[in-house]
Amino acid sequence: MQPYLDLMRHVLENGVEKSDRTGTGTLSVFGHQMRFDLAAGFPLVTTKKLHLRSIIHELLWFLRGDTNIAYLKENRVRIWDEWADENGDLGPVYGYQWRSWPRPDGGHVDQIANVVEQIKRNPDSRRLIVSAWNPALVDEMALPPCHALFQFYVAEGRLSCQLYQRSADIFLGVPFNIASYALLTHMVAQACDLAPGEFVHTLGDAHLYLNHLEQARLQLSREPRALPRLVLNPRVKDVFAFTFDDIAIEDYDPHPHIKAEVAV
């Protein structure tokens, strides 16, 4: 996970101080890219402990097309609680855009099903794209998409994924985003009988909140450990059929958790 640690160090040393929507303030850089070879291990931060249950269940929740936090709460995941309304609704956020992007004629587009089918039928396509950024509905979302658009790429029997993230909370959010999209790439690769390739993470406004700087320095003082290994149930060949029990991360030996407040 050296690319992630290098990003954190780069922002601490070169970031400019900016105000932000939450009123917390950030150190920020604009435009950064990280690459992770998924054959070299599962890209899960080891310099602090991450909550694996939250990462896995959030992705399964997205893939369900769900936008209510009831499923997350049932599975002891609290990462969306601050943004939900009194009924647990978040508006037309990621799951809705991924699975039910509205068409002008009143129908809907299942972008995930479509892209999986395209990968199988035409793996050399340059249109293997899923977007969560819908300008017509951004104002109805509890939180507009931070990880806004991703593209798959097939070469030599390997599936790679590139994510564009418009806004990147480096300390709290980015480790989750890396793991989530790496997991998604593995799942789609298995569904398409491909090997996992690279995860490429392209960031727009990459920032450390000013109340996360000491935590970031603590994390950088720790020695990275060996990456864990992702094991998927090999019998699952449908990306929508995966359950929590079909996903295992083995040999994860992180340093202790570092507490930090979420900027809402």
UniProtKB/Swiss-Prot annotation:
- Any one of the GO BP annotations: dTMP biosynthetic process
How would you classify this enzyme at the top EC level?
transferase
SUPFAM superfamilies, from UniProt?
Thymidylate synthase/dCMP hydroxymethylase
For this entry, the protein name equals Thymidylate synthase
Q: What role does it play?
A: Catalyzes the reductive methylation of 2'-deoxyuridine-5'-monophosphate (dUMP) to 2'-deoxythymidine-5'-monophosphate (dTMP) while utilizing 5,10-methylenetetrahydrofolate (mTHF) as the methyl donor and reductant in the reaction, yielding dihydrofolate (DHF) as a by-product. This enzymatic reaction provides an intracellular de novo source of dTMP, an essential precursor for DNA biosynthesis.
**Chief subcellular location:** cytoplasm
Query: Which family does the record assign?
Result: Belongs to the thymidylate synthase family. Bacterial-type ThyA subfamily.
Instruction: Provide the residue positions that the database annotates as binding dUMP.
Output: 21, 126-127, 166-169, 177, 207-209
Q: Which organism is it from?
A: Chromohalobacter salexigens (strain ATCC BAA-138 / DSM 3043 / CIP 106854 / NCIMB 13768 / 1H11)
Q: What is its EC number?
A: 2.1.1.45
Protein's UniProt keywords contain Methyltransferase = yes
What keywords sit in the KW lines?
A: Cytoplasm, Methyltransferase, Nucleotide biosynthesis, Transferase
> What PROSITE patterns is this protein classified in?
THYMIDYLATE_SYNTHASE
Active site residues per record: 146 (nucleophile)
Q: Look up the domain of life of the source.
A: Bacteria
Instruction: Please give the GO cellular component terms listed in this UniProt entry.
Output: cytosol
- Which region is the signal sequence? none
- Subunit info? Homodimer.
Per UniProt, subcellular location reads as: Cytoplasm
Q: Which reaction does it catalyse?
A: dUMP + (6R)-5,10-methylene-5,6,7,8-tetrahydrofolate = 7,8-dihydrofolate + dTMP
Could you tell me one molecular function GO term of this UniProt entry? thymidylate synthase activity
Q: Where does (6R)-5,10-methylene-5,6,7,8-tetrahydrofolate bind?
A: 51, 169, 263
Q: Fetch the InterPro entries from UniProt.
A: Thymidate_synth/dCMP_Mease, Thymidate_synth/dCMP_Mease_dom, Thymidate_synth/dCMP_Mease_sf, Thymidylate_synthase, Thymidylate_synthase_AS
